[in-house]
Amino acid sequence: SGLEVEVVPSTFKADDLIARFEAKEIGGIFLSNGPGDPLTLINEKEQVQKLIGANIPMFAICLGHQMLSIAHGYDTYKLKFGQHGGNHPVAYNGVVEITAQNHNYNVPDNIVEIADITHQNLFDNTIEGVKYKNKEIFSVQHHPEASPGPHESKYIFAQFAKIVK
């Protein structure tokens, strides 16, 4: 995709990234996956809220997807049964993608107040992806980066690259 990626720790300071965005040193932020209960990540929530307020384009997966929801004021909830494995069907634009998943938490249905649902889990109808209204921010719950696969969701990275170039 021709992008240069720089990894920053989870202890990042939003003000530093905002300054770099305003100086055109970075074109966007990717919030990655990770372990644990997203509601316990108070500092990270505050930092993501600052990034949202700065209108920086963002793409997130799994824990990052959950953090965007929480930072927008929509708390996640724990699933009765976590979703784990490499064969979870997800609907996107009338197409079924087979996805890799590994999570115990999900974003709430009322996120539709501020985001459009882009991906839906076909096992339990939980939300698998959203695009925030009037923002260049989108996210998915599953793992499009999964290797060795499945790879049906790789297009998501190209969508983000198009926004940040």
Feature locations, PLM:
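Structured helix-beta-strand junction loops
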Residues: S1, K24, A54-N55, E113-I114, ...
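Short helix-loop-beta junction
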Residues: S1-V8
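Hydrophobic anchor at the start of a short beta-strand
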Residues: V5, M58, I137
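Short acidic loop-to-helix transition motifs that present clustered carboxylates
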Residues: V8-L17, D37
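Cysteine-nucleophile active-site neighborhood
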Residues: R20-I98, P150-Q159
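Active-site glycine-centered loops adjacent to acidic/histidine catalytic or metal-binding residues
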Residues: C62, H103, H143
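Catalytic beta-strand/loop cores that center a nucleophilic Ser/Cys/Thr
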Residues: V95-K135
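A glycine-centered loop/beta-turn motif at secondary-structure junctions
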Residues: G129-K165
